[in-house]
Amino acid sequence: MDSQPTSKVLKTGFLKKRSKYLHLWKTRFCILTNKHLFAFTGIEKDADCTMTLLLENCIETKKAENELRKEFTFSVNTNNLIYYFQAENEKEQNDWVTLIDNQLNHQIIEKF
């Protein structure tokens, strides 16, 4: 985890992330900051960063249970990609969606 975020950390925890091409679900340690969403292979100091998502490039986050037919899932949408995640329970799902959505709204306000 050498690329530690320098921004304010808002939430950390394990989420399952759906892979882009094979649509496999892999457990990732995620870190949400006020500017990024990071996904790592684990919590070890040398864990690989598998995703760095700049929140200013995101347009929305929403629950995705109906779309994916999987409990506690949500999506983070950019102009050209959709990232899917699965939380352990409804509370975690709501926490992640709310915190990411708050940051997206904050990014919009900062632009004006």
Identify the function of each model-found stretch.
Residues 1-12, 44-45, 62, 67-73, ...:
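Eukaryotic intrinsically disordered, low-complexity regulatory regions enriched in serine/proline/threonine
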Residues 7-51, 96:
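Polybasic phosphoinositide-binding surfaces of eukaryotic membrane-targeting domains
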Residues 15, 58-60:
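Short, surface-exposed loop motifs enriched in S/T, G, D/E and P with embedded aromatic residues
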Residues 21-27, 60-112:
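Canonical pleckstrin homology
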